[in-house]
Amino acid sequence: MPNRSVENHLSVRSETTLSWAMRLKIAQDAARGLAYLHEGMDFQIIFRDFKSSNILLDEQWNAKLSDFGLARLGPSEGLTHISTAVVGTMGYAAPEYIQTGRLTSKIDVWSYGVFLYELITGRRPLDKNRPRNEQRLLEWVKPYLSDRKFQLILDPRLKGKYQLKSAQRLAVVANRCLVRNPKSRPKMSEVLEMVNRIVEASSAGPRTPEPPLNDVSLETARERKRRIIDLRSGEKFVWS
């Protein structure tokens, strides 16, 4: 692909920084791709190795899923899962799959949630070059999910050029994908609907950076209360 993979552009060595609008579009394209694999055909395909290096960008910066080497057909009618040897990439694999080898489409949903935090933070899911307490992305972001601290996890390479509300809402979607119980995770078609709403709201909103969280002069009390409730409802779904 002309513009390589998402992983390439999230790397600190990359000369190109993906804008926030581009990251939202990538999240949307990737969700659409997974939803099609899971629900758009007469048979189901489980990607099984969904990660940023397998999401390629074409000349128009549209995201395309690639490398289906580990993909498997979903369970036959009447079955809930497939039992397989555990394969995939550390940092993206769902905990129940690692523990049992039981394969369902919900492992892709988990991996997608990890990927959303990768887009938000610009960090790899597992990076042993960082300090010990920052090596695992999901563990590192946990203390910052509250309203006041959220900005601290946003990719510094964005240099403040992002829409804070859309980033917070994307994190809520990620949290719903990262529910410990796979049956409680949404289907990818439902995830796509959530991401579509975020993209639509972002397109209608301002392109400039939003004010700090402690500056409430530009939002009503009702809007602020709704935003806090949205974040807290998302935190209930966190993977702990």
Residue ranges and their predicted role:
Residues 1-13, 149:
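Structural motif in protein kinase domains
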Residues 32-45:
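Protein kinase catalytic-loop region centered on the HRD/HxD motif
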Residues 108:
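Conserved catalytic-loop aspartate of Hanks-type protein kinases
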Residues 164-169, 173, 180-240:
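Intrinsically disordered, low-complexity cytosolic regulatory tails
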